[in-house]
Design a protein with these regions (language model features):
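Rossmann-like NAD(P)H-binding beta-loop-alpha module
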Residues: 122-203, 210
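General beta-strand structural signal in soluble alpha/beta enzymes
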Residues: 62-64, 79-80, 103-105, 128-132, ...
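Catalytic, metal-anchored helix/loop core of enzyme active sites in primary metabolism
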Residues: 153-157, 165-168, 172, 184, ...
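Rossmann-fold NAD(P)-binding glycine/threonine-rich loop
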Residues: 88-98, 107-145
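A conserved regulatory-domain signal marking ACT and ACT-like small-molecule sensing domains
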Residues: 316-431
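A short hydrophobic/small-residue beta-strand
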Residues: 101-103, 378
Length: 431
């Protein structure tokens, strides 16, 4: 190692890779003053050199050969921004085993194989950092691992997908229906050409797996997280929620309960007074609860070229400081517990239910009898003025109930002739 320069390699030169390169170049002098060392990008791994060359002044940095990076002893830090599982996993593992430090923003990989990568880093006494894998520019992984380490964390939840938050904001503030808000999000570049991972909650689910693992010191994999998207939410649901003093947000939730971890992503009604209800457009926020700190919230841009690059470069700085201090590998995998993850049917929530029933006497009594049969306590029943073709629209809010019991009650309701349609079921956050 040159005492004034630490050399790094970028894997991938897309939106985030370009942002990281810009930040390191534009802030070169100030960063050198901050950490007492210059960080220099020596190589950038790309698939198409000709295409990438249009985005950089010095095309000699570009390579399509991984061997040029893994076999270069001068390269001490590998910054993986390729995305996906393979070949990213192969490259990261080989870099760690070769004694190189790694920074990654790859939530898809970390949500499934993060523990294997952290174990490999521990064995080689190097750092593997991934702040940018969750909520882009918002610092949350480092605070959970360091600043909040003295807490017993019982809950971490938040808005961790900017696309769906933008869509729900437009539906709430402008009365748009889902398909129109999605079209606008696509037009403005917030949604991908294939928005499935966002609108079905898969992107948020990966982030919840990572947050739960770090918060509760126990391994939670992506497959452990229940996911449900926002495609069925209507402007009518949002209107009714507003009448009740609530907003609808796609929330990622992880709770550390006495009988196991609850981890899920779904639309939820939250009180309009809750801090998360004020998080709009493409912004993200993560809300945590610990026994000592009590409630804390982290807010900011959850995606984008420079916000994500900010988190990546922050990890690079941490590694450089560790290298200079000779204390690499200080904080590896913190999942020293083995807490079971509960199945969704064993979780407990309140529910918002909107349905159409026959407009006649006795129907509401039939409904409440079915709910009572399955230990579903009803907090509120509201019959709306809307009446179409002999049907009345009814909104039900339940007390907290085991999801499996609630589902069974719903199936019996579906089979009743008096229940014409169950339009919406949304979980309700809070007591």
């Amino acid at each position: 190692m040159n005492e004034n320069v630490i050399k790094a390699a970028l894997l991938g030169f897309g939106t985030v890779g370009t942002g990281v390169y810009k930040v390191l170049k534009n802030q070169e002098k100030e960063m050198s003053a901050k950490i007492g060392c210059k960080v220099e990008i020596k190589k950038i791994l790309v698939r198409n050199i000709e295409k990438a060359a249009a985005k950089i002044e010095d095309a000699s940095l570009l390579t399509s050969q991984w061997d040029e990076i893994i076999n270069d002893p001068e390269i001490e830090i590998v910054i993986e921004l390729m995305g996906g599982i393979n070949p990213a996993k192969e490259y990261i593992l080989s870099a760690l085993k070769a004694g190189k430090h790694v920074v990654s923003a790859n939530k898809d990989l970390i949500a499934v194989h993060g523990h294997e990568l952290l174990d490999a880093a521990h064995e080689s006494k190097v750092d593997f950092l991934f702040e940018a894998a969750v909520a882009g520019g918002i610092p949350i992984i480092r605070p959970l691992k360091q600043c909040l380490a003295g807490n017993h964390m019982t809950e971490v939840m938040g808005i961790v997908n900017g696309t769906t938050n933008f869509i729900l904001t437009k539906m709430t503030q402008e009365g748009m229906e889902f398909k129109d808000a999605l079209a606008l999000a696509t037009e403005l570049g917030y949604a991908e050409a294939d928005p499935t991972a966002d609108i079905e909650g898969l992107d948020a689910g990966r982030k919840v797996a990572i947050l739960a693992s770090v918060s509760f010191n126990s391994r939670v994999l992506f497959n452990d997280v229940y996911t449900e998207g926002i495609a069925k939410i209507t402007s009518k649901d949002i209107h009714y929620a507003k009448e009740m003093g609530r907003d609808i947000k796609l929330l990622g939730v992880a709770r550390n309960e006495a009988d196991g971890i609850e981890a899920y992503v779904c639309p939820m009604l939250i009180p309009s007074s809750h801090p998360l209800a004020t998080v709009n457009d493409s912004y993200n926020a993560v809300f945590v609860h610990g026994d000592a700190v009590e409630d804390a919230m982290f807010f900011g841009r959850g995606a984008g070229e420079l916000p994500t690059a900010s988190a990546v470069v922050g990890d690079v700085f941490d590694i450089v400081r560790n290298i200079l201090a000779g204390c690499c590998g200080r904080i590896g995998c913190t999942c020293y517990k083995n807490i079971p993850v509960k199945k969704m049917e064993d979780t407990h929530n309140r529910y918002f239910l909107r349905l159409k029933v026959e407009d006649r006497c006795g129907v509401l009594a039939e409904m409440t009898a079915i709910f009572a049969k399955y230990q579903v306590s009803v907090a509120q029943i509201i019959q709306k003025d809307t009446k179409v073709e002999g049907c009345a629209e009814v909104v039900v809010i339940t007390e907290k109930v085991r999801e499996g019991d609630f589902r069974t009650a719903i199936e019996e309701l579906r089979n009743r002739d008096s229940v014409r349609k169950i339009s919406t079921i949304i979980r309700v956050y809070g007591k």
